[in-house]
Amino acid sequence: METGRGKRGRGTGSVSDFQFPVSSNRLAPRGRKIYEGKWKILYETQDPALLIQRFKDTPMVGGAAPRAKLPRRGAMKNQISAAVFRLLQKNGIPTHFVEVVGERDMLVRRLEMIRLEVVLRNIAAGSLAKRLGMEVGTTLPAPVLEFYYKSDALGDPLLNEYHVRALGLASSEELRAIRETTFRANGVLLPFFAEREILLADFKLEFGRQKGALLVGDELTPDGCRFWDRTTRENLGKDWARRSLAREAAAYQEIFRRVCT
């Protein structure tokens, strides 16, 4: 199993000095916008099987007023996600990622997305700790897998597998593949981040269909992962993002330095 280079700690590079790598691709020109969400915009390309996924610097909150801009957020999200997608693909886990084609843009395979957020928890935190009365920071005896229904109107409720099938979101075979892929991804990601002095408390995956196959889609960034410093257990991910723009910027830059520089 490939987990990246040798042990790494805090990076020393400056985000402002980093030259964000971009691949040249004839499909890079963006076409019609087909989707815009909180964090991303999707555009068509000349190939109907491929899309441009653009990461925003300024996400929308509740579809209304935007949050304050975090400079180069989109570029950092793009590079962090690309690095993790490449790692998963090297370890036999298929994703929608093709290549980076712009500072904030990646070329991705067009998927029929499944309306599930699949959360894998290694450490008690967030809603799990609150819901079950567990002490935050407790290492779980075994990873916990959860499903959430992607529905803004319903508040993304927690589901079990019977709910998933009752709603027609995924078949039993697809759920089995999703479970297996998520646990495999955890086995790849844990040592990768540990080498960078990061504890992966939990993370979110989304899946989509392409020609009968299930692929990991969406993104893998601090907005969907709970990262802690391995030594201090200082928050480096989405917990910081919920407090202030300054702390969110510091969290993003620290994760970016450890993963991408």
State what each model feature region is.
Residues 138, 220-261:
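C-terminal helix-cap and adjacent tail motif
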Residues 29-149, 259:
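Active-site loop/lid in soluble adenylation, ligation, and acyl-transfer enzymes
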Residues 65-75, 158-181:
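Short histidine-centered catalytic/ligand-binding loop motif
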Residues 169-201:
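A long amphipathic alpha-helix within ATP-dependent nucleotide-binding catalytic cores
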Residues 138, 143-155, 186-199, 221-226:
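Phosphate-binding core of ATP-grasp and ATP-grasp-like enzymes
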